[in-house]
Amino acid sequence: MTQTLSQLENRDAFIERHIGPDAQQQQEMLKTVGADSLNALIGQIVPQDIQLATPPQVGDATTEFAALAELKAIASRNKRFKSYIGMGYTAVQLPPVIQRNMLENPGWYTAYTPYQPEVSQGRLESLLNFQQVTLDLTGLDIASASLLDEATAAAEAMAMAKRVSKLKSANRFFVAADVHPQTLDVVRTRAETFGFDVIVDDADKVLDHQDVFGVLLQQVGTTGEIHDYSKLIAELKARKVIVSVAADFMALVLLTAPGKQGADIVFGSAQRFGVPMGYGGPHAAFFAAKDEFKRSMPGRIIGVSKDAAGNTALRMAMQTREQHIRREKANSNICTSQVLLANIASLYAVFHGPAGLKRIAGRIHRLTDILADGLQKKGLKLRHAHYFDTLCVEVADKAAVLARAEALQINLRSDIHGAVGITLDEATTREDVLNLFRAIVGDDHGLDIDTLDKDVALDSRSIPAAMLRDDAILTHPVFNRYHSETEMMRYMHALERKDLALNQAMIPLGSCTMKLNAAAEMIPITWPEFAELHPFCPVEQAEGYQQMIAQLSDWLVKLTGYDAVCMQPNSGAQGEYAGLLAIRHYHESRNEGHRDICLIPSSAHGTNPASAQMAGMQVVVVACDKNGNIDLADLREKAEQAGANLSCIMVTYPSTHGVYEETIREVCEIVHQFGGQVYLDGANMNAQVGITSPGFIGADVSHLNLHKTFCIPHGGGGPGMGSIGVKAHLAPFVPGHSVVQIEGMLTRQGAVSAAPFGSASILPISWMYIRMMGAEGLKQASQNAILNANYIATRLKDAYPVLYTGRDGRVAHECILDIRPLKEETGISELDIAKRLIDFGFHAPTMSFPVAGTLMVEPTESESKVELDRFIDAMLAIRAEIDRVKAGEWPLEDNPLVNAPHTQGELVGEWNHPYSRELAVFPAGLHNKYWPTVKRLDDVYGDRNLFCSCVPMSEYQ
């Protein structure tokens, strides 16, 4: 029969490209698991009472090219003005060699957080470089591998200051009046739940205030003034007050390091090291502290360790500090950071080197001096005599200045009484400065750049002599070698080859949803229409963003069954925190602020109790039964005990144990019966979309991991987006923003992130995914994720017991393989299996979560049967190797598992093992072999000998 035009147009072609198994493979897999069809399989697994009767109304699928054209038309509604607003956001020039070979390279952006260091040495090295940049510029002893943004870093600094303070009775945190307003906003939000009293005053009045445990100063104030705080810091230190300083990476190239002036903590945004503004993000924050506080640092820290052969190797150090270990004792819920963006900043520093950075910073400052000199020659007054890149200019007719600026497509900072703010950047040119003269003075300004340049070159005093940096920065060879594009390209490629990402193999991490990040989804993030907008630009310049965000929000509302969505939280953990704050403020609005007990099942992700703790709640753990389900009797008992103090329950669905609990609606009803709210963790939404929804189940609020379910890549450990969906009664209590209040912002509550829409520039990825998949495609994705997991469970259950199953022995979208019986029999652990998988070319599944001694496997819908079979074959081969150990053929202390992974170096060295080299390094054959560059890491050595800065280049030879 002749095909119709509609069939030939193939508008749902992307569905088949996103979903790994084709129709024939699906049938083969269904036969293996014993189901007649996808719908029949879902009917056996998902409780009937929560299955949607009709699909969410998010439209039909469309092609990649049609979706790109549609989004391009939306993006074109954004107006690309020159933004000199500043406030922590500036235009940048991302080196094309970094954009092409790193930002747009799936070898970098599809990797996972480097929990498996043996397959992560490349980005770990780049993150170590980032830490070295931070250490050199801040003058402190230890640095983290990035935080979410500058404002949340400020909140983390406050929390850390309280942790390490010796003034245990003090409960006040002082913030200098000239910090960025969005920073103050987030600090106030965090302080409220911690019970801290935030004092805002001029910095020189800080000594007038008593009972202060910590102080936040900003080296270059929000309106541009450079501060020499050395004397003040000394006085504060004499009082045992912890001093945090917000700083600017580019300014620090020229200015003295706050650490040298005595600061305990220094943080800020690394955005201007090559990361586009992106209407607010994503951007990496840097964070550094004195060595004595290293065990209280928030976020990830990369450390230098040794591998089993004694060679230098890198790893994430001191992971016992993290929230998933400390749980309800945590005071930070940092999980995802901003690895991809930190690595852009790191490589920017490598590419430019110290000389290049000084040239860029010097040019920015020289142009600022020229602008200042010209304006003063025209009789205008500057508020501050000392500045780096920002001027605060007093103007008589502010409206006229802003009107001229708008006509020239220029944005100035307009919220300063009687003045305008102007922040220059590395993209600013001579012509831009002339246009600024036209905007502020008028067309007949009569000023000449070269003449002004000569004047300021002779007499520039805008940076006080005491504030000029007098020490060398970035002296390590890595920052002084790769300055030609050829060298830089090869360096980035060398780093990439050390790592295992989705462009090499399936990453079967349970609870992580490492699905396809399609090229068509990624293309829009570098469009200048999205990349170049300042987050605080006038709303009429961001109509494209507003339309895109509104459409995406509407789709997410329909997919979740909620009434509203807030896009501000820029990680899943931030989403949890924001959702719990909404619950807290809702109770307070009803004069029930005493409701502070949060029930959390024992199987929960570690961020759940950490977020509850941060939101000012008491955590009460609810037991799970032998099948891994919430124990309803224990839940009812705990809810009754909490009574009028019950705030909420945090529950994951499908459960963290990988099953659809039949009683989920009853769980919701019990909590609601006692006046509590239901927080449904969205970590496992990839098994819900199109099949059921949190709102339909009965939940009140969820965060959505757009970097899991909706295809934003993990970036090697960030960025993420933790947008929250809420029922109508909670909508007035989601985060707001102090700087930007526009239509679409649901609330006037405090902010949890620096920018109003979080990491806005990666939202087009999720928009593209939903638009190309349509309602039917999204449902098929969930169905195939479930099919793939059940296929793996079915084929592996005889070799590795599946710990938890639901009705009919099925699992949801992931399964937990119980390694404990094998370890008891043979001594081989889940760690040995994880490391041996590297020799087969796979990243390990999630280890020992949510149950110690297990492996949790989540294949996602994007992996084909061919790749699933390759993984299954590897796991079965490993089981056969375990049996050989059990039989005594290989000793427990010397076999392919305990010695894994094996490196190329072992091919040419001495060989004294009872198994062959071929079995060691080519267990899956010769084709497309992945080579780890280090052997198994020595975690104990790394934590006992903490070293978190760049090592000599000879160590990498």
Curated annotation (Swiss-Prot):
CDD domains: GDC-P. Its EC number is 1.4.4.2. GO terms for cellular component: cytosol; glycine cleavage complex. Keywords: Oxidoreductase, Pyridoxal phosphate. Pfam families: GcvP2_C, GDC-P. GO terms for molecular function: glycine binding; glycine dehydrogenase (decarboxylating) activity; pyridoxal phosphate binding. Gene3D superfamilies: Aspartate Aminotransferase, domain 1, Type I PLP-dependent aspartate aminotransferase-like (Major domain). The modification N6-(pyridoxal phosphate)lysine is found at K708. Its cofactor is pyridoxal 5'-phosphate. HAMAP family: GcvP. The glycine cleavage system is composed of four proteins: P, T, L and H. Belongs to the GcvP family. This is Glycine dehydrogenase (decarboxylating). It comes from Klebsiella pneumoniae subsp. pneumoniae (strain ATCC 700721 / MGH 78578). The gene is gcvP.
